[in-house]
Amino acid sequence: MSQSFFERPILNSPYGYPGQHWELDADGQPTDRILPMRRRSDLITPVPKPKKRRSKREQGQFVLGSDDGLSTAEQEYNPTPIINEVRTHVEAWRALPNPDQWLVSPETARLLQHWRHHSFQGVKPFFCQIEAVETAIWLSEVAPKLGPRGAKFRAHLEGANAQANPELMRIALKLATGAGKTTVMAMLIAWQTVNAVRHPNSRQFSRGFLIVAPGITIRDRLRVLMPNDPESYYKHREIVPADMLADIDRAKIVITNYHAFKLRERVDIAKGTRAAIEGWREEKIQTLETEGQMLQRVMPELMGIKRIVVLNDEAHHCYRERVRDAVETEAELKGEEKDEAKENNQTARMWISGLEAVKRKLGLTMVYDLSATPFFLRGSGYVEGTLFPWTMSDFSLMDAIECGIVKLPRVPVADNVPGGDTPKFRNLWDHIGKRMPKKGRGASGRTLDPLSLPTELLTALEALYGHYEKTFEMWREEGIGVPPVFIVVCNNTSASELVYKYVSGFHREHDDGTTSLENGRLALFRNYDDYGNRIARPNTILIDSAQLESGDALDKGFREMAADELDRFRRDLIDRTRDQHAGDSIDDATLLREVMNTVGKKERL
């Protein structure tokens, strides 16, 4: 395996065409050769090999592109050929020197010129972000004017959606994590809105947008897509020319999470009372919302708009499973894998059912899926890890690494934990999973000892912390105003609480009712000072569903310590909502989400 790639992975500018790439061998490992052309869309992820290699099948490689007979006439499992073909057309179209040759509206042409050539004062769009939007524009405005050459792409999309999403038309834009999906969303909204406002009779464009996220924390971060947000991308990142900002203000945008699509009870009736009434009337009492009532609750701003565009963030959670095959798949799974499959399907079912309701009641022209991993999940009834067949653009992690957009992921090739031929840190969960706490943070969760976590996990934390400590010191010496961020992702809330306590400190309860402090084992992450007092501005925060609801990860003195930042947050809320009372009462859960969303930002919570 070549070390050249790992020593010097960056070949291209993030703002220009990625005209070079590292060659990969048959096993997906980098060679010494740099090829003077763009990388084709292939689903290969190069990482350093362990000292002892396992077979490709054991490593869980994607089966895309194999000869296993996964594709049918109705459902393609390997859309990468169509992605490369679309890419070729878009590149030729982009190279046309005269905007009159672009076959787009004057407004679209102006936006394209702005994104490609404007001298941005701040953050400039990456090539991959512009390309994703160019792909959407080309498929919408250009391809229909090319006769049979363009019709084949519409036919592909219709066929890909017919089986998986019969009520919807979806286009997936695949962007590596860190490549900036939010900016792409802002550009899509700008393109649609400006055209819809200036061509009100056109059925091709819309100024109504439903943005769906998988959770409230992601939803909060997407608020920069609202035109009236203090940090709105349209103005602060110059997504549109100044004279188009007034058009953007006419956009109707709703940002929600998929949970909002669940039909709610309109009347609270006790179980016994319900049974008595239903027995007397001999019919079921309908107390659930109708679809129309749900939509009125979730998106009242969009109720008068007939052509809505949906933007799905982290869209791999949204699909219509094959019911028979999904049941068979779940039957083959056991334990946590079976629970995961059921949870995946429940999430997907609620998400896509909500979009189908929007289509039936209001009208929906297009769904744009944005995800780094637009793959079918376990239990979907499709082959796990197969790409959504309506994926039409791809900027992979390897592309992002070669353009310097994301750092090279580091995975262990060796460790100092004795036993075994392969590094345990490489697949840590395989070695500690059965010894980790199960789901839930009830009474049993409180009796678990953070200092009794598996040795392999504690050793991994110490190893990563050692690297963090060196980076922290370098940043301090260079005068960087914020510390680097250390993120630990856990499988459930019990595990996250134990790791949190191990890292930051906790009070141990004794049999006689007294407590004693066990300070955090990683000094820079401690939430207690040397005298055992809790630090008002914590070095470590715990973010999970329970914490977001309770908000109890923040010390009572935090509000006083962060008074200036909290006041700035109140003003932001008022500007964002145009409600003078929005900042009067900020609950701890909202405050905790804001803390998480502004980690690493100066003068923020």
Q: Predicted regions span which residues?
A:
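RecA-like P-loop NTPase motor core of helicase/translocase proteins
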Residues: M1-L605
